[in-house]
């Protein structure tokens, strides 16, 4: 069997990454991005005409068609609602997946020169836990804007 991402559930994420200072200085950007994301999720997750059109468009953009894209979606863990995304990123499963990703990244030399262990970089999780170096945080999982979306407060 050819390797595909279904063999490592929870390890590959569709997410938007924004520089921490940029987001801090421009909170409207965070609101707009998260709002647009979940607006699209709401549309894509339905069998409405708009949902079908969105999946057909994204299928074409993914070098396949609507059926091929829907087959890909069927093999993925999708977070159609903000509350589902919040629950996942705060879970032990997400913590373990991020630990696995950083271990893999270190083993493959993806953490850069000078990385002497998987702890070289830090990953901040939403519950306040950190994987790796707390003085060298390079990735933060922050649920603030997802919570706003869940609360209808964007």
Where are these regions (language model features)?
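Short, solvent-exposed coil/turn linker segments
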Residues: 2-5, 80-81, 116
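Short, structured secondary-structure boundary patches
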Residues: 4-7, 21-25, 130-140
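Secondary-structure end/capping motifs
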Residues: 25-114
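A generic structural micro-environment signature
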Residues: 8-9, 24, 29, 126, ...
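Conserved C-terminal helix/tail region of periplasmic/extracytoplasmic solute-binding proteins
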Residues: 102-154
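Periplasmic-binding protein-like
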Residues: 1-22, 30, 34
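Weak global preference for isoleucine
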Residues: 8, 12, 17, 86-89, ...
């Amino acid at each position: 069997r050819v390797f595909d991402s279904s063999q490592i559930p929870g390890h590959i994420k569709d997410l938007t990454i924004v520089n921490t200072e940029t987001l801090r200085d421009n909170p409207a950007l965070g609101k707009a991005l998260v709002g647009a994301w979940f607006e699209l999720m709401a549309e894509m997750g339905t069998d409405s005409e708009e949902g079908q059109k969105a999946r057909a468009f994204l299928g074409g953009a993914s070098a396949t068609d609507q059926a091929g894209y829907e087959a890909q979606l069927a093999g993925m863990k999708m977070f159609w609602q903000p509350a589902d995304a919040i629950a996942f990123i705060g879970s032990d499963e997400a913590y373990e997946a991020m630990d696995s990703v950083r271990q893999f990244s270190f083993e493959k030399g993806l953490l850069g020169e000078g990385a002497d262990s998987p702890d070289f970089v830090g990953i901040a999780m939403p519950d306040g836990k950190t994987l790796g170096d707390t003085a060298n945080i390079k990735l933060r999982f922050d649920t603030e804007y997802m919570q706003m979306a869940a609360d209808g407060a964007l």
